[in-house]
Amino acid sequence: MSRATRRIRVRARLTAALALAALTTAWLTGCTASSPASPANGTKPELERFYDQRLAWKDCGDLRCARLTVPRDYAHPDNGETFVLPVAKAATADPGERIGSLVYNPGGPGASGVSDLAADGGEVFGAAVRARFDIVSFDPRGVGGSEPAVRCAEPDDGGGGDGGDDAQEPIAPRTAGDRSRAFAGARAEAAACVKGSRGILPHVGTDDAARDLDVLRAALGDRKLTYLGWSYGTSLGTSYAEQFPRRVRALVLDGAVDPSLGWSERALSQGKGFRRAVDDYAEHCADLAGDACPADGPQEMSDLLDGLYEEAARQPLPAGDDAYDVDARTLLDVVTDAMYSPEDSWGDLSEALGEAADGDAAKLAGMAADDEEPAGSHRTRGRARENDDEAILAVSCLDTPHPREARPYWDALAAADRAAGVYGTSSVVDELTCADWPAGTRRPHEVRAKGVPPVLVVGTTGDPATPYEEAESLAGQFPGGMLLTYEGRGHTAYGRGGSCVTRAVDAYLVDRRPVRADAAC
């Protein structure tokens, strides 16, 4: 996934602060106990102590919570260095009908699965699934309540503690001076994260997180894994299927990330996805936003947006005395964020754009502030500071090789500008920090998962962040892969795409019922 704040998204939640406080207490007091037998077949002897652990569950609000210990470096599991990962469970109400655990990842990378589960107790899942599975999630290594976690110190250039203020970067640095400043700022951001994370950055990649997922499977007592991943969670699930194909029971990947794409291809794919979504918004603004739509037609709406971008690039849009003025990057963040859930956001976006065009950007500034600390998402007050922005940077840079020199980024910038305008160029600029990042070992590749059972990929035709074409590609890369198409807008489908999607996914998860070749909702 691209790493700007606007690109991290999990499903909307209404979170209870008391439940989160209880979660924090449970993490601090939880422990693990050994079991006399390992549930994993073929486990290397040096990993047996991790696979043999049993989770010591404690009450935490309406959930049960525990901690899982995994090796920091799977190549050297006996060196004494570990990650301790928070785990949470919403137990099925009917233990007699229980199939096992359903583990899920809400996206990111960088989203706390524990906070996400605390927000609704697993209610996003269909009733048929909740009746047959314990719903389980966890904070991946380096994320959220993980000990240790990714942290970025303040860059030497004076940026913020989360690795820099990307709202001040030019969306498309075109002059030599702008490009030099952008590249220098990205290098400072990378150096700040290396300094603040104290040596853990080489160990927070998706392949290692997938190995943690297998340790969690064993600790839960499940012989095989039942899993659902949204957005980045599809990368985690794909990696698990490649490493442990015969330990998969059922795998749902919703909002697919295509592992065969390199960094520039992925940036271009996402840029095009947002461009299409914004064009769709311009075309249907009046239908969804009614009188709040500030333009009479698609071209007028596009012209209004382009005019605001140009104005904000020259001088931030005035938001009054009680808010920061809105520069071009902040405007872009607000617009793209609204593409994730049109049914919830397009009305507010339309009102904010109309008021900004009339000289008052206060509502835009308020939406930007909400995006920084959105009510009902994994960025929730009441627990230790989460590190989603830092983690999305760390995982994304480690997972995909990037060039060290600047020229390839400027070449990609030109191609993205032609294909997707500001939405493409911003995606490329987001990649700059990876130029100075510790190198990982992953390379773009098609899925290699011989022996995995049929995997269900869910794709949304109007998905801005994980375009539908990537779902088609990923489904085709799995042996026996199945594609369920949701003909709709917004990011991901299960939990927001209606009863048709829910029935198909639930039937697959519970009964492993396949979907037909042309399945669509």
Annotate the PLM regions.
Residues D280-Y281, T330-V335, D348-A352:
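A general alpha-helix detector
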Residues V257-R275, S350-G354, A361-R381:
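Flexible "cap/lid" loop of the alpha/beta hydrolase fold
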Residues L317-V334, Y340-D344, T380-E390:
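Structural motif
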Residues M1-S35, L213:
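Secretory targeting and sorting signals
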